[in-house]
Amino acid sequence: MKKLLILITIIIAVYIGYEMGNGILNTQTVQTQSQTQTQTRKPESTDTISQIKNIFDNIKTKLEGNENTNENKKETAKAGKNESQTFFERLNNIRNIKPAIEKYKQNENFVPSNEIPDLLKKGVVATEDRRFYEHGAIDIIGLTRALITNYKANRTLEGGSTISQQTAKNIFLSHERTITRKIEELFLAMQLEKSYTKDEILTLYLNTIYFGHGTYGIKDAAQTYFGKKPSELNLAECAMLAGLPQAPTAYDPINNPDDGKRRMMTVLTLMTQEGYITTEDALKAKKEFHVKKG
C-alpha cells in the first residue's frame, strides 16, 4: 500500500514537472555538460535530474528501436554528440513519437479505425477506461477509485492505467513493474494524447493489445475466435473481445467457454450502464453468441 502511494506521488510530481518543463524549454538557457563538470560539488538535485535523464534515454532508445538498422548505426555514431545534450534537449528529442507510430501502422495486420466496429470501441471504453474521453494521459479520479477498491478488497481488483498508458506500454515498453517503467509509460502516454485524437489512440490500442490464445491485435483475434474480419463482428462478439484484455487466459471463450460467456455478459452490462446499448440489445446478444471451435 505504501509503495503504491509513493508511486502515485512520484508520477503526479513528474507529470507536473514535465508540464512546467515544456514552458521552460522555450525560454530558459541551460548550461552545457562541460560547464557542469567544472563545479567542485554537485547539489543533491543533480542526482534526481540524472535519474530522470536516464529515463528519457531509455524512452529514446525504445523509440529508435522502431527504426531500421541503418538508422540505429547512425545514432550510435552520434553517441558522443548526444552525451553533451542538456536535460531539456533530451526531453525535446522524445516529444515527437509520430514517426515510430506511423511506421508501426504500416504493418499488414493493422486495422484502420473505419474497419473497427463502433460497438467494439464502446465496449473497450466501458470496460477498460470509462472516463477515456474526459481525461488526459492519466486519470486521477480513476486511479484514486482503483486504489480505494483494491485497498478495501486487500487485493488488486482494478487497474489505474488509462487506455493511453496501456497503448504506450504495448508499443514501446516491457511489462516489468518498476517505478522507472511507470514514469516512462506516463511520458509516452502524454505524447500520445498530444499527437493523436482519442479515436486514433483507441485504434492503436485495439491493434496492439493481447487478446489471448496467442493473438495480438483485433485482426487476429476476430479471425481466431470467430473466423471473421473485424468489420463483421456483431454486438456479442464485440463484447466478448472487449472483455478479454484484463484476463485473456481466464476468459478465453475457446478454452473456458463458461467463464468467457460470463465475461461477455459483464461487458454487456457495463455497456448498458454507460448508455451505449439497451437492456434488450444485451439480452439479444446473449442468445446470438457463438464461438468458433478451436
State what each model feature region is.
Residues 2-294:
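Juxtamembrane regions of bacterial inner-membrane/periplasmic proteins
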